[in-house]
From Swiss-Prot:
ATP binds at A9, A10, M11, N12, A13, G14, K15, S16, D88, E89, A90, Q91. It comes from Legionella pneumophila subsp. pneumophila (strain Philadelphia 1 / ATCC 33152 / DSM 7513). The lineage of its organism: Bacteria, Pseudomonadati, Pseudomonadota, Gammaproteobacteria, Legionellales. One of its GO terms (cellular component) is cytosol. Pfam families: TK. Belongs to the thymidine kinase family. One of its GO terms (biological process) is DNA biosynthetic process. The keyword Transcription regulation does not apply. Its main location: cytoplasm. This is Thymidine kinase. Homotetramer.
Length: 209
């Protein structure tokens, strides 16, 4: 029996990487997958799901007015049967679109894997996440860590100086320059340690970085 899965996490937990790996696993076995990504996410090329480690794949960019159930039916008429539907940045789904995902699972018998944030920078649920938490068959937490080493469960919005931002619109598209994943303690303190990873080259002569 097909199920609706919600993979949730804080920022930078590798959600898109896991999504792309899941799609690859299906396609490696000759199965078709259908990928959706919200059009509102303008960080990368339009209609593309990108991971921080460099993986990418084309996807259908949807708007809040799109019916994902109808789109999946229409796309399936143009190709062979889909074995899985995957949704990136699922927190941006509307209540109606989450219901449409349940229809894809229940009426079309296609597994749906949705990946997204659980809460916004205020610690409040996104609409899409709220109804995925309520209606998904399986909930899977993808873990990442705070700068202190504890598990990060909060998404802190920061300004250009790395200071915590506590007011503003719920949706502000951004990456590491705008958000930091932290534990609850450092979120409440408004403390974010903003670091920029340095690429180290491996020296084959010394067998070390």
């Amino acid at each position: 029996m097909a199920k609706l899965y919600f993979y949730y996490a804080a920022m930078n937990a590798g959600k898109s990487t896991v999504l792309l790996q899941s799609s690859y696993n299906y396609r490696e076995r000759g199965m078709q997958t259908l990928l959706f990504t919200p059009a509102i996410d303008t960080r990368f090329q339009y209609g593309t799901i990108c991971s921080r480690i460099g993986l990418s794949e084309q996807a259908y960019a949807f708007n809040n007015s799109d019916n994902l159930y109808v789109l999946t039916q229409e796309f399936q008429l143009q190709t062979q049967k889909y074995s899985c539907v995957l949704i990136d940045e699922a927190q941006f789904l509307t209540r109606e679109q989450v219901y449409q995902l349940t229809e894809i699972t229940d009426q079309m018998s296609i597994p749906v894997l949705a990946y997204g944030l659980r809460t916004d920078f205020r610690g409040e649920l996104f609409p899409g996440s709220q109804f995925l938490l309520a209606w998904a068959d399986e909930l899977i937490e993808l873990k990442t860590i705070c700068h202190c080493g504890r598990k990060a469960i909060m998404n802190m919005r920061i300004d250009e100086n790395g200071q915590a931002v506590v007011e503003g619109e719920q949706v502000l598209i951004g990456g590491n320059e705008s958000y930091v994943a932290t534990c609850r303690l450092h979120y409440k303190r408004g403390e974010a340690e903003v670091t920029f990873p340095r690429n180290k080259l491996f020296n084959k002569d010394t067998n070390a970085f």
